[in-house]
């Protein structure tokens, strides 16, 4: 699987992800980019789940963003509705972490849209490790969102065998 973490602090939101693609117990690729910018570079998105499904999900989510003029919450709810009702999408076991200058959301394969506490998202196999690290750093340091995301992803990569140290990091300042 993978680890995706999103942190928001002081007018900055960051989504970071590692690059490991695994097939069972075998590392197939170490430099996959699972985080990208969408909708005129105004929305960040990260993906945890099967890599082959990422392109379809990003494409569909970007279409929803276009349909709703970049309104993240509306696009996320519409994407979740499609995910619940589309037979092909329902088979995907995946999560999307998305963020813009107003909110951070998790979109699940069950059709849920969750706005997490403290605008902190951590998903994937190393998500619990990254979330623990990011929470501690948010509560006990003055580090930037970028620094917290990077450090928490590093910690997750040190602990989780399905997370590596290759990082893709995208940030929005607002």
UniProtKB/Swiss-Prot annotation:
GO MF assignments: metal ion binding; threonine-type endopeptidase activity
Annotated active site: 2
Catalytic reaction(s) noted: ATP-dependent cleavage of peptide bonds with broad specificity
Listed PROSITE patterns: PROTEASOME_BETA_2 (PS51476)
Subcellular location(s) of the protein: Cytoplasm
Chief localization: cytoplasm
Gene Ontology, cellular component aspect: HslUV protease complex; proteasome core complex
Record InterPro entries: ATP-dep_Prtase_HsIV_su (IPR022281), Ntn_hydrolases_N (IPR029055), Proteasome_sua/b (IPR001353), Proteasome_suB-type (IPR023333)
EC annotation from Swiss-Prot or TrEMBL: 3.4.25.2
Regulation: Allosterically activated by HslU binding.
Transmembrane segments: none
Function statement: Protease subunit of a proteasome-like degradation complex believed to be a general protein degrading machinery.
Family indicated by similarity: Belongs to the peptidase T1B family. HslV subfamily.
Subunit field text: A double ring-shaped homohexamer of HslV is capped on each side by a ring-shaped HslU homohexamer. The assembly of the HslU/HslV complex is dependent on binding of ATP.
Name of protein: ATP-dependent protease subunit HslV
Originating gene: hslV
